[in-house]
Every structure is written in C-alpha cells, then in structure tokens.
Amino acid sequence: MPPTDAARVTTRTAESAEAPPGPRERLLGAGDPPPFETFHPAGRRRALIVCDHASRAIPAALDRLGLPDEATWRHIAWDIGAAELARALSARIDAPAVLAGYSRLVVDCNRRLEDPNCFVAFGDGQRVPGNENLSDPEKRLRAAACHEPYHKAIAARLQEFRRQGAVPAVISVHSFTPVLGTEVRPWNVGVLWDHDPRIAVPLLARLRAEPGLVVGDNQPYSGRHPADYTVDHHAESAGLPHVCLEVRQDELLTPSGIARWAELIGRALTDILADDSLYTVWQARESRAGGGSR
C-alpha cells in the first residue's frame, strides 16, 4: 500500500541545525528545499532506509548549473523512481528513511568529498557547465549546504538506535538505467554487498525465487567498489548489517511499478529483518585488512 502524506515529515536534525549557518544560507534560499527529508520517522523496525540520489533539485543560486531543464530529468541528475520506492518501502516495512534533498549534480552524497566524481562536470554525454573548474571554496559551500546535513541526519538516526540499545540495519535504495552507453543491463534488480552477507545473501535467494526476475549479485554495480560512501561510512565501517538495492528504472516509472517493487522487496526484507540474531556488530569486518584491491 503506498504511503500517505501523513507519513512524510521533512525536517533537519539537531546536528544539521547547529551547523554554522553562513555557507548554507548563502547557497540555499527561502524557496529551496531542505537538504534532506526524513520520512516515517516513527517507524518501529530496527532499520534505516537511505536514498542518496532521491532528488533532482538544484539550488536557485546555481541557476540550474547551466543545464536545460530536460537534462535535470535524466538519470545523471538523480536515481529515477528511487525516492518513491524508498518511501513506499519505508511504509511497507515500518522503518524510518532519510532521503537526500538535492541532485547528485550539485554534490554526490554517495561520494567522498575528495572524490573527483563528487562534482561531475561531464556525464553520459552531458556537459555540466556549472560544475566546470569549481574552486575549493565553491565545493565546500555545496558540501556544507547539502552533503554534510544529509550525512549528519543519517548519523543522528543511527545514534538514536544505539541510544535505545539497538544495532540497526541500513538499507540503501538506488535505481539504474536499462542501458548505459552500449551496455544492455538485463537485471530487474541488483543486490550490492561487500563482506557482510547477513542481509544480502538471503535477500538474493528470496528475490531469485520470484518467477521471472533477473537478479544481479553485485550487478550492475559492485558493493565492493570503494566509491559507495554512504554504506561504507555509516554501516560497513561500524559493522552494522546492511545492503544496497539497485532497481532498474523502467520498473519504477508508474505508481503500480513502485507498489510492486515495494511489495516484492518488502516481503523479502520483512522475513530477513525478523531474525533477532541479525542485530549484532559484524565481527568479520576486520577481514578487509591486508586484502586485495576492490
């Protein structure tokens, strides 16, 4: 069942509200959306859903980064359908969610700030004039306005679980294009993971049991790639149970498609998250030390 408007609460956490106001006020104006959205904050599940590329919004001060409007509707600006799926899944499994408030073209919330791909000047054939030759102060301005508040909101939610004595699970929601360049991507959904198999492996098994689904194991992207900042920073480094989901965008273009995938994934996750033994710190995370390159 799709979530109602009553379930949505958009807010800033105490941490983000206490951040120095200067840079953010200079970039974000009164008509701009907040840097993150908190959805279904009263969810009772010991899990947090995050969505890094939920929005195509660009601060008015950045003048759409010099792009035509139609370019901001492309996948280079956001993960199409991911926000709606994250909200529907949040309602389906009764877990809070934090969604990024700005386009990945402003600053990519799933990248470290020092990563060159955090501020993309050219992507999938599209030049982004407003990202060309960015100075370090300009990058810091965007980070302070959009990247840092989002990650502080996630950290605050996870800390609240810990204050209650819980080890929370983290579920990251993304979407991907059916074709990228000349590569045709046959998967309906991908399950991304690195060392911790506790959610990913049973989720793969449950999704593969669904008739007609092509399910990718670390496809079309790999959870072992070091660029997946949000999961690495908030979950993997802390030993929290976690998984990243990638659903093909053409599956998420209609309300019925969103509802179908929220039901499919939600049903599988509900069984997995019902296991109390899941909610412990993953001790094997130290196995990364001395390993080969990812």
What are these regions (language model features)?
Residues 2-170, 175-294:
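N-terminal catalytic or cofactor-binding beta/alpha core of small enzyme domains
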